[in-house]
């Protein structure tokens, strides 16, 4: 997801520079003082040009990849918060299964590490002031990081026929929504159970046959408790 990152809010300062100047004058500043204030406020902010608008569109990231690699299949960005990369994977697998495409790139990137982001996550008790300790009594939130990852996906039969170096096989992918719950950001055991159950049903695996599970691990009291109860219900019934 692009959305302009931190440059979006900074470029908006230039959009409102005329209003800032007028407010300063209305508050008693001279035109010269108002001009100096606006210049100082806008100093270092990106100028608005032909790349500003495209840079604020969420789809531009995938669009640039398609443009660079001359890819001619569907390209779009998915936004499902922490599950965005999984949502991209879900769509990619569906397109491959219905044979609308033969190869898909699915991935995600996150690099918006700035003060407002820290403040907002702290306000909901999700950002740890010290360190991340998921599923631990000391858990007090997670530590944010930056990174990116992308998968090249093909139907297994095609990959084997092409002699590709197959790293892993996706047997099933599942998704769900929490529906109505305690709050818009509150996790739901019902939704989690549905998503995981659908994935295992498609894979034709029983949850009890799986020996390694990668958890979300938000390191928050509510998030960890909900996820553990979900896994316990699936694995022990």
PLM segments and residue spans:
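Condensing-enzyme catalytic core of the thiolase-fold
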Residues: 1-237
């Amino acid at each position: 997801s692009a959305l302009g990152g931190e440059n979006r809010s900074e470029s908006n300062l230039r959009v409102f520079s005329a209003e800032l100047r007028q407010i300063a004058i209305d508050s008693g500043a001279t035109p010269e003082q108002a001009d100096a204030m606006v210049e100082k406020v806008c100093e270092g902010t990106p100028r608005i040009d032909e790349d500003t608008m495209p840079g604020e569109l969420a789809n531009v990231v995938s669009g640039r990849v398609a443009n660079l690699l001359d890819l001619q299949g569907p390209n779009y960005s998915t936004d499902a918060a922490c599950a965005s990369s999984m949502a991209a994977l879900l769509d990619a697998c569906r397109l491959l299964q219905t044979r609308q495409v033969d190869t898909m790139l699915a991935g995600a990137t996150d690099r918006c590490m700035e003060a407002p982001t820290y403040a907002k996550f702290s306000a909901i008790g999700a950002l740890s002031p010290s360190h991340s300790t998921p599923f631990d009594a000391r858990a007090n939130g997670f530590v944010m990081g930056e990174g990116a990852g992308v998968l090249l996906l093909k139907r297994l039969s095609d990959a084997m026929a092409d002699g590709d170096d197959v790293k892993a096989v996706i047997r099933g992918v599942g998704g769900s929504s929490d529906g109505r719950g305690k709050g818009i950001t509150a996790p739901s055991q019902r939704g989690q159970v549905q998503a995981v159950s659908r994935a295992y049903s498609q894979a034709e695996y029983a949850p009890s046959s799986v020996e390694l599970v990668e958890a979300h691990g938000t390191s928050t009291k509510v998030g960890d408790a909900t996820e553990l109860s979900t896994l316990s219900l699936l694995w022990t019934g």
